[in-house]
Each structure stands twice: as C-alpha cells, then as structure tokens.
Amino acid sequence: QDLLMRQTGYSLLRSNDNGDTWEGPFPVNTAPVARENSGGCSVGGSGGGHIVELPDGGLLMPLEGAITLDQTAYAPGGVGELCRVFTLRSDDGGNNWEYWATVAFDPANVVYMSEPSMTRLQSGKLVCMWRVQIRPGFRFDNMWFATSEDDGASWSRPARTPLWGYPPDLIQLQDGRVLAVYGYRRDEFGVRGCVSEDGESWSKDNEFTISTGGDADPSVVNQYWHTAYPSVVQCEDGTVVVAYHEYSKGELPLQEMWVTRFKMG
C-alpha cells in the first residue's frame, strides 16, 4: 500500500489529436515523494502547472509533495514534514516519469511550499514560482520563486516576491517579458497578473487586475473563498487568454469556468 500511495498520487491524460480526444488517466510514478497526509493534498500541483519541454526532448513536470507519510503534519501543533516543490522528468514523451530534482524545501518545516508553475525562457533559464504558507498558523505568504540554468538539475536559492496571491501560472510572452497570473483571495477577490522583464525582478508597480469578484456568500458556501486557479496562454495574434473558476451568483452558488482575453500593454 505504501508503494501504491507513492505511485498513484498523480495522473495524466494524453491526446494525439490536438485535444479532440483524450486517453487515460495514466498513473504517474512520483517516488520517492509520497502522499503527505490523508486529510490534505495528495502529491500534486496546480491547475496551471505546465509541463515544460527541453531542447533534448525531455519533459519536466513541476509538482508538490512530501517524502514522509506524516498524517499529523498539518494538524494544529504538528511538526512533521511539509510539502516541497520538486520536478519529475520523462525521456520517452511522457509515458514514464522519475524524480528529477527538488526545487525548494524548508528542512525546518516552517515554510510550506506548494502549487508550482514553471516556464522555460528563450535564454534557456527555467523559472519556477509557487504558493507559500507559514507555520504555525499556515498564514498565506507572498509567492516565492527559483531559477535553474541546467534544465532543472539544480536550482537557485528560493527568493520571496512582493506579490501576494496563489497559485501562480507563468509564461514568457512573445516580447520576452514574463507574465505571472494568480488568484487573489482577499479584499475584492479575483485574478491578478504581473509582468517581469526577466522572470526574477518582480514589482507591485507592474501588477494589474484581470478579474474581480467570484467569491460566494460565506453563510451559504463553506469554501466561499475557493476561486481562481488561473491558467494562461498567449495566442499567435499576441492576445493573452486566462482561464479560471469562480462562483456563480444566486441562491445556490455553483463553480463556473470563465475565460478572460486581453492584450498586453
């Protein structure tokens, strides 16, 4: 059962006709990273955690997870191992996957890192950004990031951005800038974006609003705040498309998928 938990925490669907039909799900081997507790997240990522293709044909998948099976890690007063951000690699087109590298991990088990997104720049540099929470109260911190110059075999020291939100999705735009989109689950709620010249220098001055609202009435929906999880692409005509989820209006709020399309300034 321990081996099964380590190998079936994440699955993939595959399409050979540009998304018209799909096969799967196919279990992904994530060993030695295992499911971290029965009451929280399994090994996984975020909705926008793109798989990155390398020049040699290898594929990198950014994920989160913990190696030990500590069911008390996220309980009040827990001290067990928290999530790390790591990557899997496939060299056969995504049929088989193996652990490749840890992107970021706090051995003190104070910083909880999860829901990563990764993009490869034209220079060859990889940029990975992720959601962060801090013990003991698991407060939501700003997003953090790291970079790699060797196709993900090793990573820079993690750095904290000035951007609050979660989780992020990253792409490099046609003009070379890097765009991060992320959920904003406080105040007016919604989805926000921020551009960086190099994927490493991030400023609140470059933050903008993509959508607002989408949260539900907390007296009606327990997880009224569960919105966003954006995924972003840039079309050939240069427009940017962001997909995300939010609650509908009305007496019985339902989760709906929305798409916003816009041009970058």
PLM ranges: what are they?
Residues 1-265:
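Asp-box/BNR beta-propeller blade signature and adjacent active/binding-site loops
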